[in-house]
Amino acid sequence: MDIRAAEISAILKEQIKNFGQEAEVTEVGQVLAVGDGIARVYGLDNVQAGEMVEFESGVRGMALNLEQDNVGVVIFGSDREIKEGQTVKRTGAIVDVPVGKGLLGRVVDGLGNPIDGKGPIQSTERRRVDVKAPGIIPRKSVHEPMATGLKAIDALIPVGRGQRELIIGDRQTGKTAIALDTILNQKPAHSGTDENAKLYCVYVAIGQKRSTVAQFVKVLEDQGALEYSIVIAATASDAAPMQFIAPFAGCAMGEYFRDNGMHAVIVYDDLSKQAVAYRQMSLLLRRPPGREAYPGDVFYLHSRLLERAAKMGDAAGKGSLTALPVIETQANDVSAYIPTNVISITDGQIFLETDLFYQGVRPAVNVGLSVSRVGSSAQTKAMKKVAGKIKGELAQYREMAAFAQFGSDLDASTQRLLNRGARLTELLKQPQFSPLKMEEQVAVIYAGVNGYLDKLPVNKVREFEDQLLGTLRSKHQDWLDSVRDSKDLSDANANTLKGVVESIAKSFA
């Protein structure tokens, strides 16, 4: 075989010409010490705050403390595989998570990795978890209602799209139940075709038991609500950095809907546990402690998270992200550090009480202490018309009920007030998993406020309500449709309703 030298040199030249000049440079550091989920790393001089780093074992961490001679890294996962002297390399990426509609119906961890065994996430877009909240100009004031399906909330403490409404109460008072009912109440909208009516739901479970989260997901599945929801779970057995980052990850997923002209609601359940996880991380990183040993920036931790919930203006696509943070109090102490912080950040709070819960008032909302600072600007006209009086009457009732315990001889007007209050309180009770549509709530509250229940025994109020709703659904569907479409209670509709309510009241007389 004849080999020509010219040919060989031509082949060599061709290969040399295409030889890649770029060499991959990665900055590598060394683990100085590791323990309690924190690694001290030497040699990562150019690492950014909040950057993801990777350890030899494949475990990831986030650089939080940038000191003169070392970097404090919190570890997302177990630190058992990490040994002193091992190498750590920069990834060059700030912590980000997958976002988009591909996450709907899935359960993921704090970094967006699936944990439900349904295969990889179908998502192409990623977003940073910690971004700046929208400024003042792109926002719009809250003006559309975010229906929870609960009479006590939609009538008295209305929540609007883009609002931040805190759910606060002791353990076992039904905080998660309110959030769950709100998610289930969005099902009818998702069955329809009106994209603007749809509200996508993001639920972040922080520091909860795995069994509790599994039960929550099962209820969503059984009720057909998982298909428009995303569940982010950083359970009690997960590392503190996971519990710290999960709310930010959930927020980034919710912001995808907000920024693309859609509407979403995010539930942080609960932020007390996130604050505890952050306190643990901060103390281990040797940051100076403040009140109740929380770090000085724990207020900023929650404010930068909750400020990202917003109603966007017309130029920014009209989307919205509503936040329902949950805070667990100890023995109804609302004046502790974290509760006062979050109350001051949010636009109102739904205050749940153990005593009410055990008296059978469920949802156990204390109407006197609960407020919505956005208030009636987020209510439909129909609801405003009927629910205007109810708050005042209940406030008077509570005041009188306290005095009535002492005196037996009460005048007629006081007796009337006490009667009405007892029946309105009964009317606001609602079993779990049975949210009501806005127009149905209007009918029920109309009956209560206009005195049709005053002569009824208290134990018949629920029966009256069921009969009223049954009659409207079977014989007056056109009335329900009319109120729903117009969002107002016209005189003609009010007269129709009056007739229906009066006929049912007669049957109870």
UniProtKB/Swiss-Prot annotation:
It catalyses: ATP + H2O + 4 H(+)(in) = ADP + phosphate + 5 H(+)(out). The record marks 370 as: Required for activity. Its EC number is 7.1.2.2. GO terms for molecular function: ADP binding; ATP binding; proton-transporting ATP synthase activity, rotational mechanism. It comes from the Bacteria. GO terms for cellular component: plasma membrane; proton-transporting ATP synthase complex. InterPro entries: ATP_synth_asu-like_sf, ATP_synth_asu_C, ATP_synth_asu_C_sf, ATP_synth_F1_a_nt-bd_dom, ATP_synth_F1_asu, ATPase_a/bsu_AS, ATPase_F1/V1/A1_a/bsu_N, ATPase_F1/V1/A1_a/bsu_N_sf. CDD domains: ATP-synt_F1_alpha_C, ATP-synt_F1_alpha_N, F1-ATPase_alpha_CD. The keyword S-adenosyl-L-methionine does not apply. HAMAP family: ATP_synth_alpha_bact. This is ATP synthase subunit alpha. The gene is atpA.
